[in-house]
From Swiss-Prot:
Pathway: Amino-acid biosynthesis; L-lysine biosynthesis via DAP pathway; (S)-tetrahydrodipicolinate from L-aspartate: step 3/4. Belongs to the DapA family. Keywords: Amino-acid biosynthesis, Cytoplasm, Diaminopimelate biosynthesis, Lyase, Lysine biosynthesis, Schiff base. SUPFAM superfamilies: Aldolase. Gene3D superfamilies: Aldolase class I (3.20.20.70). This is 4-hydroxy-tetrahydrodipicolinate synthase. InterPro entries: Aldolase_TIM, DapA, DapA-like, Schiff_base-form_aldolases_AS, Schiff_base-form_aldolases_CS. Pyruvate binds at residues 57, 211. HAMAP family: DapA. GO terms for molecular function: 4-hydroxy-tetrahydrodipicolinate synthase activity. Catalyzes the condensation of (S)-aspartate-beta-semialdehyde [(S)-ASA] and pyruvate to 4-hydroxy-tetrahydrodipicolinate (HTPA).
Length: 301
């Protein structure tokens, strides 16, 4: 294994298992910061060594700037692992403001999604991240999720993004393992899987960890999986991946990850309410049952 490959495997600047944390809300729809602190402590105790707040699973499209800032502060108060804040938008100026304010609140890094809906050119993508980079003081994680953004980012564009001072990592939710290999080799950026079902395959091509939905209730076995992989015990890693497969399907299969993550946490008694803000709707009885069945099949209940 080359020195570069070892760097990809060993350099996990924000942790290995990072739940994309839901934002607990009270029955009136206001953010429940006390419940968020309880959840953050639970996740770390269960094995998470980094947390992502204000991401898609955290209902970032419907939470406001002051709530995002306060959530970062609240979580930072109670955990001693890296706290990454989502700070992405399809409006570059708004993205810059979010980056500045969440950094000031104490975020250890920012997760910046590709500018969705607007469908900019490759030059526009680079311009977006360059503007963010110029205002950043903390590391930037590029979030590539074409299913939500409608963008296909070329390998050459990744080369240009990697030249920016604060761009240090990628959350890859493209599902394209072959392209990920080339992008990693060319950029040297730390790579995080953005897909629970592809965690082990992404590890096999050099990813350092995952930003995950199922880690809300499965951080411990996911840590066991990555540790088994690190020591070369692929049989155990594969067994754990197969064990978690029903949970992956239960929480991700219908595409309502934020809803199902809250369902799983409610079943486990970790959050008091599954309230969500429209256009998302909290889980119904069928979804709660599905979350419970997925956890039970994965040996987590």
């Amino acid at each position: 294994m080359s020195e570069h490959d070892m760097h990809l495997l060993d350099s996990a600047p924000f942790g290995r298992i990072l739940p994309a944390m839901v934002t607990p809300m009270k029955s009136d729809g206001s953010v429940d910061f006390a419940a968020a602190q309880k959840l953050a402590k639970y996740l770390v105790a269960d094995g998470a060594d980094g947390l992502v707040v204000n991401g898609t699973t955290g209902e970032s499209p419907v939470t406001h700037m002051d709530e995002k800032v306060e959530l970062v502060r609240a979580v930072k108060e109670v955990v001693d692992v890296p706290v990454i804040s989502g700070a992405g938008s399809n409006d570059t100026a708004h993205t810059v403001r979010m980056v500045e304010q969440t950094q000031e609140a104490g975020a250890d890094a920012v997760l910046v999604v590709m500018p969705y809906y607007s469908r900019p050119s490759q030059d526009g993508i680079v311009g977006h991240y360059k503007a963010v980079d110029e205002s950043a003081e903390k590391p930037i994680i590029v979030y590539d999720v074409p299913g939500r953004t409608g963008l296909k980012v070329k390998v050459g564009t990744y080369d240009r993004l990697a030249e920016l001072e604060h761009v240090k990592a990628v959350k890859d939710a493209t599902g394209d393992l072959a392209a990920a290999v080339e992008k990693q080799q060319r950029t040297g950026l730390a790579w995080y899987s953005g897909d629970d079902g592809l965690f082990l395959p992404f590890l096999s091509i050099g990813a350092v960890g995952i930003i995950s939905v199922i880690a809300h209730v499965a951080s411990n076995p996911m840590q066991q999986l990555v540790q088994a992989f690190d020591r070369g015990d692929i049989t155990t890693a594969r067994r754990l991946a197969n064990q978690l497969a029903p949970l992956v399907h239960a929480l991700n299969g219908d595409g309502y990850q934020a809803v199902m993550a809250k369902a799983a946490l409610k079943v486990k008694g970790v959050i008091p309410s599954t309230t969500m803000r429209l256009p998302n709707i909290g889980p119904d009885a069928t979804q709660l049952d599905k979350a419970e069945e997925g956890m039970r099949a994965a040996g987590l209940l």
